[in-house]
């Protein structure tokens, strides 16, 4: 971090001489006031806010004036001006972040995506890396390419575990055993370096701190919980931002800055905190933090998506904020598991949350749905009816009577904007996971009888997968593991527990045979994963109690 006394010494004229020494407090990019088209641009105000201030302080007030950020009301006894300079320097943010965070006004094009290789340019070979994956959306976000790298010492960290489990007991003891065996069985990765945590609930944070090594990098997709984790560590271990020069020297905060940790800890943490936002790709540069006796690096998020379509283009702004703000997640669903019932109809009756997806159960099936996605749900006679209603909501000049159920923009108010997916056969319950959105639990009830495949229609560009219900899978597996003294695996070996879905043509009638055909194509180079290939599909689905999860296959 800047040595503030040195940074302010000799500055008498408003120019880049002040700005170049300051990074945006939100995204960590270097500030500049010369080119609005380049990152880090900061708008000059039209007039100075207070000409009576000494020149150094004028410059810093000048920086912040157009962002409506108020000066701290606290002042040190010896030099109040010095404290004001310090606060201002540490709180300057670029125009892009100011508009996005304070006015909720942002252009997605100003938040470009990065690839894994882009981000790895920040990470020296042989470094300690924490691969951050939100457990709530497992296996989405899990990147085998990161875990298999020989040039990095990688640990898997599963965040947001409070959105899957009722308490931290399973998170502490049961998840690591399950994940070790899952990685070995599924990806042939032999590793026991897995932590499941919840930064919001403070689950396993002390264990995590004791484990991670000095100079560790946090690596993952946008909005997976990296910055929230850092802020929890900063609060728990009195951490702060640092700046590391090209020689590796750590520039720690000045004594005046550190003094505030004791005199005004709230303000100190506000200044030091990592930028947490529901906006993806907010972080644009690596930021180092001193946490206890260790250095931790927050890296920008990287994308693995092949689609350039962004959720901001599809989903209503207010709905999207609810989806991304994890602190708004209602944990009562985890404990109570309140379900909604739905019967499959001959007309193609469907269930939706905001129009973000349409779930179509087969005719005659009785289904229970537990929703872990924010927003009210709605059922429609068929998909066409749902799309027609939401199209009216978007085009209506006034308030449509069903507008509270609409979470999509007009750009996807056509059936052609959705992809049709068939869910491979299952018995009992599954969880359907939508990347960066959440998941629902789907349960078929009554005596098993195959009535057809469930379908789900999803906007193009959104990744989806299914899994056996995660909490029950880990709990039952752990019990089996303990009862057999570790002889039985806590992760099932007799069947796949995760799967991708199968895209269908809109007019495909024989979805079961189409699924088998796609399954054979997807496993053509992975023959060891094939199961039941010689069985007739319609005979196979009559015996799911013995032949579980046919045609399940996950494409990493």
Swiss-Prot record:
Pfam families: MMR_HSR1. Residues 113-305 form the CP-type G domain. The keyword Mitochondrion applies. GO terms for molecular function: GTP binding. GO terms for biological process: maturation of SSU-rRNA. InterPro entries: G_CP_dom (IPR030378), GTP-bd (IPR006073), Mito_lipid_metab_GTPase (IPR050896), P-loop_NTPase (IPR027417). Residues 1-21 form a transit peptide. Disruption phenotype: Increases frequency of mitochondrial genome loss. Keywords: Mitochondrion, Transit peptide. One of its GO terms (cellular component) is mitochondrial inner membrane. It is found in: Mitochondrion. Its main location: mitochondrion. Belongs to the TRAFAC class YlqF/YawG GTPase family. GEP3 subfamily. Interacts genetically with prohibitins and thus may be involved in the mitochondrial lipid metabolism. Present with 937 molecules/cell in log phase SD medium. This is Genetic interactor of prohibitins 3, mitochondrial. It comes from Saccharomyces cerevisiae (strain ATCC 204508 / S288c) (Baker's yeast).
């Amino acid at each position: 971090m800047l040595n503030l006394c040195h940074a302010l010494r000799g500055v008498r004229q408003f120019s880049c001489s002040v700005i170049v020494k300051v990074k945006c407090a939100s995204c960590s990019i270097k500030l500049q006031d010369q080119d609005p088209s380049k990152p880090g641009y900061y708008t000059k105000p039209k007039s100075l806010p207070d000409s009576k201030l000494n020149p150094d302080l004028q410059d810093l007030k000048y920086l912040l004036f157009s962002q409506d950020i108020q000066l701290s009301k606290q002042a040190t006894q010896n030099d109040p001006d010095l404290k004001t300079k310090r606060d201002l320097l540490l709180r300057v943010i670029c125009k892009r972040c100011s508009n996005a965070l304070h006015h909720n006004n942002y252009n997605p094009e100003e938040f470009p995506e990065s690839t894994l290789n882009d981000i790895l340019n920040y990470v020296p070979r042989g470094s300690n890396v924490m691969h951050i994956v939100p457990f709530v959306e497992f296996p989405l976000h899990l990147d085998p390419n990161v875990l298999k790298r020989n040039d990095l010492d990688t640990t898997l960290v599963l965040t947001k575990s409070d959105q899957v489990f009722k308490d931290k007991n399973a998170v502490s003891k049961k998840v690591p055993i399950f994940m070790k065996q899952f990685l070995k069985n599924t990806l042939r990765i032999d590793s026991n370096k897995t932590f499941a945590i919840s930064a919001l609930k403070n689950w396993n944070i002390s264990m995590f701190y004791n484990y991670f090594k000095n100079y560790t990098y946090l690596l993952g997709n946008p909005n997976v919980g990296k910055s929230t984790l850092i802020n929890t560590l900063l609060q728990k271990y009195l951490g702060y931002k640092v700046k590391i020069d090209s020689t590796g020297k750590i520039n720690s905060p000045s004594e005046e800055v550190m003094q505030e940790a004791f005199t005004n800890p709230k303000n100190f943490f506000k200044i030091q905190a990592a930028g947490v936002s529901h906006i993806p790709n907010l972080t644009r540069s690596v930021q180092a933090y001193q946490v206890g006796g260790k250095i931790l690096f927050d890296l920008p998020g990287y994308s693995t998506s092949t689609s350039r379509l962004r959720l901001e283009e599809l989903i209503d702004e207010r709905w999207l904020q609810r989806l991304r703000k994890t602190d708004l997640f209602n944990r009562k669903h985890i404990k109570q598991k309140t379900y909604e019932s739905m019967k499959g109809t001959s007309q193609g009756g469907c269930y939706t949350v905001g129009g973000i997806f349409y779930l179509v159960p087969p005719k005659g099936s009785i289904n229970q749905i537990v929703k872990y996605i924010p927003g009210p749900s709605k059922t429609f006679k068929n998909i066409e009816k749902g799309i027609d209603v939401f199209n009216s909501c978007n085009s209506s000049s006034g308030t449509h009577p069903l507008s509270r159920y609409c979470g999509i923009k007009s750009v996807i108010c056509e059936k052609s904007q959705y992809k049709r997916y068939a869910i491979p056969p299952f018995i009992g319950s599954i969880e359907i996971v939508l990347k960066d959105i959440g998941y629902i639990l789907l349960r078929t009830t009554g005596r098993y009888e195959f009535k057809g495949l469930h379908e789900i229609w999803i906007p193009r560009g959104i990744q989806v997968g299914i899994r056996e219900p995660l909490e029950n899978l880990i709990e039952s597996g752990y019990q089996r593991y303990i009862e057999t003294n570790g002889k039985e695996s806590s992760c099932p070996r007799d069947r796949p527990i995760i799967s991708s879905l199968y895209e269908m043509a809109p007019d495909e009638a024989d979805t079961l045979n189409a699924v088998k055909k796609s399954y054979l194509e997807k496993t053509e180079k992975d023959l060891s994963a094939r199961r039941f290939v010689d069985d007739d599909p319609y005979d196979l689905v009559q015996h799911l109690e013995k032949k579980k999860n046919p045609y399940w296959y996950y494409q990493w």
